[in-house]
A protein has these predicted regions:
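Short beta-strand or tight-loop elements
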Residues: 39, 63, 104-106
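Acidic-leaning, charged glycine-interspersed low-complexity segments
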Residues: 86-128
């Protein structure tokens, strides 16, 4: 099921050696749960839209995932965001319950909140 898209996101991000050099293993789903040091990455599923044929057969889903990079240094946050993009964009994956057949960066923005530089990237994943 595409509801498990987080497994794909985590795998691709944690498999990136370049990203690991920048953030170690600080990749979290939805929340860090506890206070941690910078920099780190958080991801969350924003939406899931099922796709059906005219005969109502499910053909897959389009899943939107937001990945946020948090750092105390602006240039570092941008560098990490670039590595996140490299790790996810156009990457496919096969899992027990679903396959990721396409991944595209849909948007990116940045912010500064409570002494933290934030880079937000939104990806669209097509699954079957």
């Amino acid at each position: 099921m595409s509801l498990s898209i987080g497994a794909h996101v985590y795998k691709k991000l944690s498999d990136s050696t370049e990203l690991a050099k920048l953030i170690s293993d600080k990749i979290y789903a939805i929340s860090t749960k506890t206070e941690i040091s910078f920099p780190f990455v958080i991801y969350r599923r924003n939406s899931l839209v099922p796709e059906y044929t005219k005969d109502r057969y499910g053909t897959g889903d389009t899943v939107s995932v937001e990945v946020a990079v948090a750092s105390d240094n602006y240039l570092n946050s941008v560098t990490i965001a670039e590595e996140v993009r490299k790790a996810l964009e156009n990457k496919r994956g096969q899992y027990d319950n679903f396959n990721v057949i396409d991944a595209k960066l849909m948007s990116a923005d940045e912010d500064f909140i409570e002494d933290t530089f934030i880079q937000r990237l939104v990806f669209s994943f097509n699954t079957e």
